[in-house]
């Protein structure tokens, strides 16, 4: 059994750790509430953008490769969103596992793009070359960050460096659950956007001037940026939720460990007192007998 001094030292160390994790939990809780509100505000915009894309795509020709795709897919670009910082449980591990699995499933060569220092470090450790990398904003992204990433991914497609572009990120469900998903950005084909569905947005018919193809050429890059923006917000909310949950669990575990160590210390102190009393009693008996 450890000595009383060692137990006291361990208890103090664990208490110090609990203070740190509790503070991190409080900070993450504040950031999480802000990030969650941004996700809820941005979702309707992203959904409306998809409605507009469906309406225009239904009226456009299929000659535009950014909409219809290319005949042969030789290379795909895979953009993965991770966090800049750790202490967020399995948040990064699960999206990176999903990325590796998706890359292995592709019949074409995979071109990797990474956002977040954790993802960048992961791919460099595995010696996977990065076509582009972004960092320094994952916990509080701006629309300008989404534009940089979106424009970079669009350039890869326009220059024919990639024939398809995919985005892998953690979709926010709740503070304890983030679901890794794969979304195709280019060719841009929103669900339900097949030709012949009619040019309507929320039931309202539209005429496109000068024509749907011209509008589509200008809208697709903005559509990609919108999807990236939504993904960045979802990932940020998931990161703060995961960190808040992880720090709460760490604090709870630390408090339980303090209770366990305190019980051990009390038992050790009781044993020491009992031993000292026994020694005093034995000494008294020896003196009386002498």
UniProtKB/Swiss-Prot annotation:
It is a peripheral membrane protein. Keywords: ATP synthesis, Cell membrane, CF(1), Hydrogen ion transport, Ion transport, Membrane, Transport. The keyword Membrane applies. The keyword Membrane applies. It is found in: Cell membrane. InterPro entries: ATP_synth_F1_ATPase_gsu, ATP_synth_F1_gsu, ATP_synth_F1_gsu_CS. One of its GO terms (cellular component) is plasma membrane. One of its GO terms (biological process) is proton motive force-driven plasma membrane ATP synthesis. Pfam families: ATP-synt. Its main location: membrane. GO terms for molecular function: ATP binding; proton-transporting ATP synthase activity, rotational mechanism. PANTHER family: ATP SYNTHASE GAMMA CHAIN (PTHR11693), ATP SYNTHASE SUBUNIT GAMMA, MITOCHONDRIAL (PTHR11693:SF22). Produces ATP from ADP in the presence of a proton gradient across the membrane. The gamma chain is believed to be important in regulating ATPase activity and the flow of protons through the CF(0) complex. F-type ATPases have 2 components, CF(1) - the catalytic core - and CF(0) - the membrane proton channel. CF(1) has five subunits: alpha(3), beta(3), gamma(1), delta(1), epsilon(1). CF(0) has three main subunits: a, b and c. Belongs to the ATPase gamma chain family. This is ATP synthase gamma chain. It comes from Rubrobacter xylanophilus (strain DSM 9941 / JCM 11954 / NBRC 16129 / PRD-1).
